Amino acid sequence: MSINAAVRSSGPVTVEVHTMGRTFDESTVDQWELEAARRALKNLKTVAGGQVMMDLLAGHIDAGDRFHKELIEASGGTYRESRTAFTVSGLSGTDLADWFRSQAGTGRFQDKALLLNAHPEHYVEPPNYTGGMVETIGGHLTRFKVSVARELPPPVSAYLDASYPVTLMNALLSLDDGTPFAYCLHQARDTGTGAEVVVRVIYPSAAPDSMIEGHCRHLAIEFRSWIRNAAAATR
């Protein structure tokens, strides 16, 4: 067997990087790549924000509207949840709720950078909305309005968990024409070391598993970012 053949059959390819007088493994390079991607996205969102971004995405947004209206019609007023939970050390649920209310108590984030940068797929806050977002949901670019939900339909409120007594936010998500298509139910409870947090988005029951699973991951990225923002604000 030749040396080349032996190398090819010896197992997976790994890479070490030698630079700046040090050696780095691939996990470090992955982190550098992630940081670079975040910088690139931040630059793009800054340069092509607002109505410019809305115009660029218009066709995709219209397709997203049609997708969600079809889900609503197929669901007949029934729902299912996407749910992600967090165990937080060093920040109480009460402090997180105070921060969240100060930022989004009206349904509109006060610090737009914290909203846009919480997730790579937060494309733009529609400039004519008092609160809202264009983001990827179910593989579709989705434009929605956010408003505080003072009252919840009984099938939605049934998802609230009384063992999490601290409310972060209850919100209604509506399509551009005012059609309700989802609800946010975000709760927490204090622990001896910090908090336990559970965040839910309640979707029409016809939402496919891939959409629910994708949004569970979306919530993990988004709320980890906001938990870190809240912790930084309390220091």
Where in the sequence are the language-model features?
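Hydrophobic ligand-binding cavity/cleft-lining segments
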Residues: E35-P127
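Surface-exposed beta-strand edges and their flanking turn/coil or helix-capping segments
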Residues: W99, V148-A149, S210-G214
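Histidine (H) residue identity feature
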Residues: H18, H60, H68, H119-H122, ...
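Generic detector of short, locally flexible boundary/turn motifs and exposed helical patches
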Residues: V17-R22, K45-M53, I61-A63, A149-P155, ...
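Glycine-rich portal/gate segments that line the openings of hydrophobic small-molecule binding cavities
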Residues: G107-Q110, L114-D176
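Beta-strand/loop substructures that line and gate deep hydrophobic ligand-binding cavities in soluble
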Residues: S2-L44, V166-S225
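Hydrophobic/aromatic beta-strand elements that line small-molecule binding cavities or substrate pockets
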Residues: F86, V148-R150, V156, A182-D190
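Short, highly charged C-terminal tails/helix-capping segments
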Residues: A230-R235
